[in-house]
């Protein structure tokens, strides 16, 4: 416990809240252009080829974003919408691409959890 004299000398520092998605600049989503689409392998206990894209955002940042769902149509120069949200087993991937908007089509033949993958209700 500090003395009053110590508190007068240098006051308590407020705790800074750091954002987990700095490239979005406080916006819920950002538009960007894919510069590279490739696969990466996850961290230790897991094994897969996760689809990711390098995206240049309108805020000027170059980020790595995860492409959710089975199958995608993204390639270089595709315009995508990016939201926050990390992928736990991919280090450095702190963003998700929003399916069903701009150039990213929804997941084909998706029946459940459709809203998360940009799929319309089947007739």
Curated annotation (Swiss-Prot):
InterPro entries: NA-bd_OB-fold, Ribosomal_uS12, Ribosomal_uS12_bac. This is Small ribosomal subunit protein uS12c. Belongs to the universal ribosomal protein uS12 family. Coiled coil: none annotated. Keywords: Chloroplast, Plastid, Ribonucleoprotein, Ribosomal protein, RNA-binding, rRNA-binding. It comes from Physcomitrium patens. GO terms for cellular component: chloroplast; ribosome; small ribosomal subunit. One of its GO terms (biological process) is translation. CDD domains: Ribosomal_S12. It holds the Pfam family Ribosom_S12_S23. With S4 and S5 plays an important role in translational accuracy. Located at the interface of the 30S and 50S subunits. It is found in: Plastid, Chloroplast. PROSITE patterns: RIBOSOMAL_S12 (PS00055). Part of the 30S ribosomal subunit. GO terms for molecular function: rRNA binding; structural constituent of ribosome.
């Amino acid at each position: 416990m500090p003395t009053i004299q110590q508190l007068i000398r240098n006051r308590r520092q407020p705790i800074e809240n750091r954002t987990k998605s700095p490239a979005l600049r406080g916006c819920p989503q950002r538009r960007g252009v894919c510069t590279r689409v490739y696969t990466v392998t996850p961290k230790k206990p897991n094994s897969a080829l996760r689809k990711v894209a390098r995206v240049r955002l309108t805020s000027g940042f170059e980020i790595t974003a995860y492409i959710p769902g089975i199958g995608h149509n993204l390639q270089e120069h595709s315009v995508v919408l990016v939201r926050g949200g990390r992928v736990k087993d991919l280090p450095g991937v702190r963003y998700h691409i929003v399916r069903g908007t701009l150039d990213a089509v929804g997941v084909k033949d998706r029946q459940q959890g459709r809203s998360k993958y940009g799929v319309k209700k089947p007739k």
